[in-house]
From Swiss-Prot:
<dbReference type="GO" id="GO:0016740">
    <property type="term" value="F:transferase activity"/>
</dbReference>
<dbReference type="GO" id="GO:0005737">
    <property type="term" value="C:cytoplasm"/>
</dbReference>
<keyword id="KW-0614">Plasmid</keyword>
<dbReference type="InterPro" id="IPR038152">
    <property type="entry name" value="Carbam_trans_C_sf"/>
</dbReference>
<comment type="similarity">
    <text>Belongs to the NodU/CmcH family.</text>
</comment>
<dbReference type="GO" id="GO:0009058">
    <property type="term" value="P:biosynthetic process"/>
</dbReference>
<protein>
    <recommendedName>
        <fullName>Nodulation protein NolNO</fullName>
        <ecNumber>2.1.3.-</ecNumber>
    </recommendedName>
</protein>
<comment type="function">
    <text>Involved in the O-carbamoylation of nod factors.</text>
</comment>
<keyword id="KW-0963">Cytoplasm</keyword>
<dbReference type="Pfam" id="PF02543">
    <property type="entry name" value="Carbam_trans_N"/>
</dbReference>
<dbReference type="InterPro" id="IPR043129">
    <property type="entry name" value="ATPase_NBD"/>
</dbReference>
<dbReference type="Pfam" id="PF16861">
    <property type="entry name" value="Carbam_trans_C"/>
</dbReference>
<dbReference type="InterPro" id="IPR051338">
    <property type="entry name" value="NodU/CmcH_Carbamoyltrnsfr"/>
</dbReference>
<dbReference type="InterPro" id="IPR003696">
    <property type="entry name" value="Carbtransf_dom"/>
</dbReference>
<keyword id="KW-0808">Transferase</keyword>
<dbReference type="InterPro" id="IPR031730">
    <property type="entry name" value="Carbam_trans_C"/>
</dbReference>
<keyword id="KW-0536">Nodulation</keyword>
C-alpha cells in the first residue's frame, strides 16, 4: 500500500498565478508512506530553493517516486492536505479577485491536470483524497508519538477555515473534541503583533528569541485586551484590536531599525499571552479527560519556549511534538491518515529520526561533483572526517557539515548543519555576522551526546531524549559560562540530544570534539544563509560555502577548503537563471521628479522582490538560454577588463542573494588530482 501525501500550492514554479491567502498553500512537501511506514519525505523548498515554497511540490514528488523505484501510477492514494470544499472556495475567491485568469474551479480537476502535465500520466480521481488540514496535523503528531492514547492539540495561522483542533487519539483513531475558528487564531495573534516589531510572516520564531530580553509586565494589561479566557477551556482572540491599540501605545519598529527595550518587553508580553492561552486550554481538557499525554502539531508548535514550559509544568507526563509541525508536516499526516483508513496503520512507536530526504550519493559521485568546482576549492578525501572536523572546530573554525540523507522539517539535525565550538560567547555574534547576516540576539542550539545531556542540562525525570530541537530546557547554572555560544540570555537552550544508534556520523564528530576539549557538545545551526532554505545537495553546500565566510566544509568523506579563484576559474563556471527569477525593464522614478527606464531581476511575483541591476548585466542575462559559460558571455558583452570585473562583481552579489546561479558546466567533468592534506 503506497500513500503519497502532499502539501503546498497548485501552480508551477515559474507561475505566479495562484496568489492565495498567506496562511495557506505554503511549505510544500511530499511524503511517501508504504504500509504505514515513511520511506521518503522532503520539503519542496529544499529542491526548488524557494523558502516556504507555495508551488506544486513536483520535485518532492519526483524524489519520493525515484527513491521507492515506482511511478505515479503505482500510488494507491494521493492525499492532499486540505478539504476539497476549502480548496474550491479559495479558487472561487481567486477568480473574483483576478477575473482575467483561466483556471478550473475544481481543485481535484486542477490537481489531476497538473500531475498529468508534470508526470505524463492520468490519475484516477478515485485515488485522490482531500484531507482536513487540522486532522492532517493531528495525525502527523499522534501516529508518531508512540502513545496509545493522548490529547492532541494543533494550532497554527489557519487552514480549512479553522486555526486549531483539540482531539483525543486512541489506538488507530483520532476523535475531535473542539475546533478553533480562524477568527481565534493564535498564529494570527502572533503575526498581527510582530508586524509592529518590523517582522512578518515566517518571522515568528525570531520574536520568540527576542522575548527573553524583555519583561512582560509593562504590556500585560495591554495584551489582556487582545484575548479572553473562557470557562470551558476555550478562548477568544480580538484580532481587530491589536493594530489600533499598538499604534497608540508603542513606538512602531520598522525593519532594520534597532530594538528598544519597549520592543523587547512587547515580545515578552506576546509570548506570555500565547503561553497563558495554551496552558488554559490544555489544563482544562487534561483535567476533564484525565489524559496525561499530549501530541502537538501546527506552526505554533514550533514555539519551543512554550513546549519547554509545558513539559516542565507537570500537566502532562509526556509530550510529543511533531518535528515538522508546520504545514509540510501535513503532507506526512495526510498520508498516514489515508494509509490508516485503507487498512495500513502506522506502528505505535515513538519517532526516532527524520532523515528521509535525498542522499548525497556514493563517494565517487560526491568527488566528481566537488572536482567540477575546479579552482574554487581544495579537496581532500579523509578516512576519519570526524576527527579532522573536530580538530578544525576546536581550533576555532566554523564549518559546514553535510552527511547522508537530509532531514525532513525545518531543523538541521546533524546532516545539513553548520558546526562550531559552543564555548566562546563570541561565536554567536560571529556566526550571525559571517553566515546568517541576521540579528545578533538570535540564539543557537547545542547538540549534545545523549549519554551526557543530563550533566549539562536540567532534564525532567520522564525525558532524557530530545532529538528534534523541539524543547527549550534550562542549562545547568554551573555550565552556563562554559557554554557561552549556546546559552540564551535567560539561561536556556533549544536542545538536541544525539544518539549513536540513530546518527553515528554526527555522534562521532561530537565525541571527537569531546576527546579534544572535554565538552560533548557542538553548536549546531542550519546550513544556509539568510535568503535561502537549508542546503540539500552537494551543489547547494558548495554554493553556500563559497558565498559565506565559513572556514571549512565537510561533505561525506571529503574535507574542503576555499581557494582564491582566478578570473579564468570564474570564467569556466556556467551562468543561469533560477526558474523563480525573471528579468524586467520598467519605467520608474530614480530621483525627484525624474523617471527613467531601469532594469530589474525579480525572485517573486512583484516588484517587492526586485533587485535593480545594470543595463550591461541585463543585456548579458537576456542572452542566456538555459545555461551558458560565463567567460563566453563576458567576451561578447564586456571585452574591456574593467567592464568584466565590474560585471563579475555584480554577478557575485546576485549569486550570494540567489538571484542567479553560478555552477560548473554540466559537461565539465575533467578530473584533477585531490590536494594534499588541508589545514585551517
Amino acid at each position: 500500500m503506497l500513500c503519497l501525501g502532499l502539501s503546498g500550492g497548485l501552480s508551477k514554479i515559474h507561475e505566479n498565478s495562484l496568489d492565495l491567502p498567506n496562511t495557506f498553500m505554503h511549505d510544500g512537501a511530499a511524503v511517501l508512506v508504504r504500509d504505514g511506514q515513511v520511506i521518503a519525505a522532503v520539503e519542496e523548498e529544499r529542491l526548488n530553493r524557494i523558502k516556504h515554497s507555495n508551488k506544486l511540490p513536483r520535485r518532492s514528488i519526483q524524489y519520493c517516486l525515484e527513491y521507492a523505484g515506482v511511478q505515479l501510477s503505482d500510488i494507491d492514494c494521493i492525499a492532499y492536505y486540505a478539504t476539497e470544499a476549502f480548496c474550491n472556495a479559495m479558487l472561487e475567491r481567486l477568480l473574483v479577485s483576478q477575473s482575467h485568469m483561466s483556471i478550473p474551479l475544481d481543485a481535484k480537476l486542477l490537481l489531476r491536470g497538473l500531475l498529468a502535465q508534470e508526470f505524463g500520466t492520468e490519475v484516477d480521481p478515485s485515488r485522490i483524497s482531500f484531507v482536513s488540514h487540522h486532522l492532517s496535523h493531528a495525525w502527523s503528531a499522534f501516529s508518531m508519538s508512540g502513545f496509545e492514547q493522548s490529547l492532541i492539540l494543533t494550532i497554527d495561522g489557519g487552514g480549512d477555515f479553522a486555526s486549531g483542533l483539540l482531539a483525543v487519539g486512541s489506538g488507530t483513531e483520532v476523535k475531535p473534541l473542539a475546533t478553533f475558528p480562524e477568527s481565534d487564531s493564535l498564529g494570527l495573534l502572533y503575526l498581527e503583533t510582530i508586524k509592529y516589531l518590523g517582522y512578518g510572516m515566517f518571522d515568528e520564531y525570531k520574536v520568540m528569541g527576542l522575548a527573553p530580553y524583555g519583561d512582560p509586565a509593562p504590556h500585560r494589561d495591554l495584551f489582556e485586551q487582545f484575548y479572553e479566557l473562557l470557562d470551558n477551556g476555550g478562548y477568544r482572540i480580538y484580532l481587530d484590536r491589536i493594530g489600533p491599540t499598538l499604534l497608540r501605545s508603542i513606538e512602531v519598529r520598522r525593519k532594520g531599525m534597532p530594538f528598544t527595550q519597549q520592543h523587547k518587553d512587547l515580545s515578552a508580553s506576546l509570548q506570555e499571552a500565547l503561553e497563558r492561552i495554551v496552558f488554559h486550554v490544555l489544563r482544562h481538557h487534561s483535567e476533564i479527560t484525565g489524559i496525561k499525554r499530549l501530541s502537538l502539531a501546527g506552526g505554533v508548535a514550533h514555539n519551543c519556549t512554550l513546549n519547554g514550559k509545558l513539559l516542565r509544568s507537570g500537566i502532562f507526563q509526556d509530550i510529543f511534538v511533531q518535528p515538522a509541525a508546520h504545514d509540510a508536516g501535513c503532507a506526512l499526516g495526510a498520508a498516514l491518515m489515508m494509509s490508516n483508513e485503507l487498512g495500513q496503520s502506522a506502528p505505535r512507536e515513538r519517532l526516532q529520526e527524520v532523515y528521509w530526504g535525498p542522499d548525497l550519493g556514493s563517494d565517487r559521485a560526491v568527488e566528481q561533483e566537488l572536482i567540477a568546482w575546479g579552482g574554487h576549492i581544495e579537496i581532500e578525501r579523509c578516512d576519519d572526517v570526524a576527527s579532522r572536523a573536530a580538530e578544525w572546530i576546536a581550533d576555532g573554525a566554523v564549518i559546514g557539515w553535510v552527511q547522508g540523507r537530509s532531514e525532513f522539517g525545518p531543523r538541521a539535525l546533524g546532516n545539513r548543519s553548520i558546526l562550531a565550538d559552543p564555548r566562546p560567547a563570541t561565536n554567536k555574534d560571529r556566526i550571525n555576522a559571517i553566515v546568517k547576516k541576521r540579528e545578533g540576539y538570535r540564539p543557537f542550539a547545542p547538540s549534545v551526546l545523549e549519554e551526557d545531556a543530563n550533566e549539562f542540562f536540567e532534564l525532567p525525570d520522564s525525558r532524557q531524549e530530545f532529538p528534534f530541537m523541539n524543547f527549550v530546557v534550562p542549562v545547568r547554572e554551573s555550565k552556563r559560562n562554559l557554554l557561552g555560544a549556546v546559552t540564551h540570555v535567560d539561561g536556556t537552550a533549544r536542545l538536541q540530544t544525539v544518539s549513536r544508534n540513530i546518527n553515528q556520523a554526527y555522534w562521532e564528530v561530537i565525541n571527537a570534539f569531546r576527546k579534544r576539549t572535554g565538552v560533548p557538545i557542538l553548536l549546531n545551526t542550519s546550513f544556509n544563509n539568510n535568503v535561502e532554505p537549508i542546503v540539500d545537495s552537494v551543489a547547494d553546500a558548495v554554493t553556500t560555502f563559497l558565498t559565506t565566510d565559513l572556514d571549512g566544509l565537510v561533505v561525506g568523506s571529503y574535507l574542503i577548503k576555499k581557494r582564491t579563484a582566478s578570473p579564468e576559474d570564474w570564467s569556466r563556471l556556467a551562468l543561469s537563471l533560477p526558474p523563480y527569477s525573471s528579468l524586467h525593464q520598467v519605467r520608474a522614478f530614480t530621483a525627484l521628479d525624474r523617471q527613467e527606464t531601469v532594469c530589474e531581476i525579480r525572485t517573486g511575483p512583484s516588484s517587492r522582490e526586485a533587485v535593480r541591476i545594470s543595463s550591461e548585466l541585463f543585456e548579458l542575462l537576456m542572452r542566456i538560454d538555459g545555461e551558458a559559460p560565463l567567460g563566453d558571455i563576458l567576451d561578447l558583452i564586456a571585452p574591456n577588463q574593467n567592464q568584466r570585473e565590474a560585471l563579475l562583481n555584480e554577478l557575485r552579489g546576485l549569486w550570494e542573494q540567489r538571484s542567479v546561479r553560478l555552477h560548473p558546466m554540466r559537461a565539465d567533468s575533467a578530473a584533477e588530482p585531490l590536494s594534499s592534506p588541508i589545514n585551517l
